[in-house]
């Protein structure tokens, strides 16, 4: 009965429509052996080529024999099998990471576009309950997705609507560690959920429905806000606080290596809601950069700090510095050439800003820090602004301001022009 229902579900959902080479994760337990059997008998209708991937965790004496048996089964079925053995200090997380790294490698090397796992409805209920116990955010209580991106293709979980009780008792290997309550998932499966089902026999289904409802809520809100430019500060501020929170959570999903604690999330949200111009270092080599118009989270650059450098430019010479081409007294050809009046009698110093810098504007010296604030110059522009200096006095801050000193040189007989052209950085 399950075979017909499975095939019907796969054809309705079209999980395999875009896949021809499919890799099945097989542990040897009832769940994965059932999945293997279902895909074998549905192979022709689904138009897929199958292969098996198996990881021997080396934690039980019988695991080597089980691996050999799976290799034999694969040969009998005429299906390729890829195996690997775990080594190192064992933990649930380490083993999981090893498995999926191995699966991804096999997919890439064998050109498989789908990895299929045997997670079922009971696993889904356990996952939702476990995340609830650990205090996960609401969006993460949606449980496992039936299809999601993975490695060079997709990870497909076709059994999420089937219960373990639906599976026939076919040949499989029983993992004795599943009955040991050393791990949280085993305690949930063997102790917590059975007790709660005494109060509500439909408790597992209730957990699954909760997960599905949360997933639908997440999908609906994402759809309604899909056209918002979240990195636009004005757009972000126009939203009510609850929508701001949702948008930021959605935005953070783009950074797989960045897992903020609840406290860190609140700090970032507060910065976006209140700070005007700000840079905030986050964990995992990420930083938040915000100016008056936009914000972004990005990887911290490990390039050499160009701000420690300065360079001398002599008359009738050309040089490149800070993603610009500078020509002292020799005209440049091209579009968008900037011009600054300078003296031809002494060399120019090109550098980045320093603490305490000031520039003469309208007869008064003004600190660069205050100038940047008044002009609402973004943090990025502040750090990349090139200072043009002559005789230890600032003539210009590129793209920001030109000093009275440079303007006065326009009518000086000993003046010339510094030509500036942007180059690709």
From Swiss-Prot:
Q: Keyword set for this entry?
A: ATP-binding, Cytoplasm, Ligase, Nucleotide-binding, tRNA processing
User: What does the protein in this record do?
Assistant: Ligates lysine onto the cytidine present at position 34 of the AUA codon-specific tRNA(Ile) that contains the anticodon CAU, in an ATP-dependent manner. Cytidine is converted to lysidine, thus changing the amino acid specificity of the tRNA from methionine to isoleucine.
Gene this protein is translated from: tilS
For this protein, the record's PANTHER family field holds: TRNA(ILE)-LYSIDINE SYNTHASE-RELATED
Protein name, UniProt field: tRNA(Ile)-lysidine synthase
Residues recorded as binding ATP, renumbered to this chain, are 27-32
**Biological process terms in GO annotation:** tRNA modification
Stated family: Belongs to the tRNA(Ile)-lysidine synthase family.
